[in-house]
Amino acid sequence: MAVCIIDHDNIRGVIYVEQVHGKDKVLGSVIGLKSGTYSLIIHRYGDISRGCDSIGSPEIFIGNIFVNRYGVAYVYLDTDVNISTIIGKALSISKNDQRLACGVIGISYINEKIIHFLTINENGV
């Protein structure tokens, strides 16, 4: 399982890439964006030393997410991404080719008995 922590200005979230019932899925939630549609994109580098300006060119479009009127996006997307090929790269949340937030994709601890899914209510809790 891979995980990406997003924490940029007021935009925060956790995105996982994992197998669910034998299929690869992108799961998670993000808060702090305005209502609308945004893109999840994997970039060449995991270098966030200059924020999203140093993550390199886009490589893989994962899919679109919808942010509700409370500023919350719940992510549940199918993907054919090979998890081992994205470790160490960056994931961005973008709109109109503008990178709004990003994080580095890392290896996540796998707990076979319990998988916690981050949920956030309209109050950000």
Curated annotation (Swiss-Prot):
MF (Gene Ontology): copper ion binding
Give one GO biological process term: superoxide metabolic process
Superkingdom of this protein's organism: Viruses
The yes or no answer to whether the keyword Disulfide bond is present is yes
Q: What is its main location?
A: virion
Question: What are the UniProt keywords, alphabetically?
Answer: Disulfide bond, Host cytoplasm, Virion
Report disulfide bridges, numbered on this chain: C52-C102
GO CC, any one term: virion component
Record's subcellular location:
Virion; Host cytoplasm
Task: Spell out the family assignment given in the record's similarity comment.
Answer: Belongs to the Cu-Zn superoxide dismutase family.
Q: What does this protein do?
A: Superoxide dismutase-like protein with no enzymatic activity.
What is the protein name stated in its UniProt record?
Cu-Zn superoxide dismutase-like protein OPG175
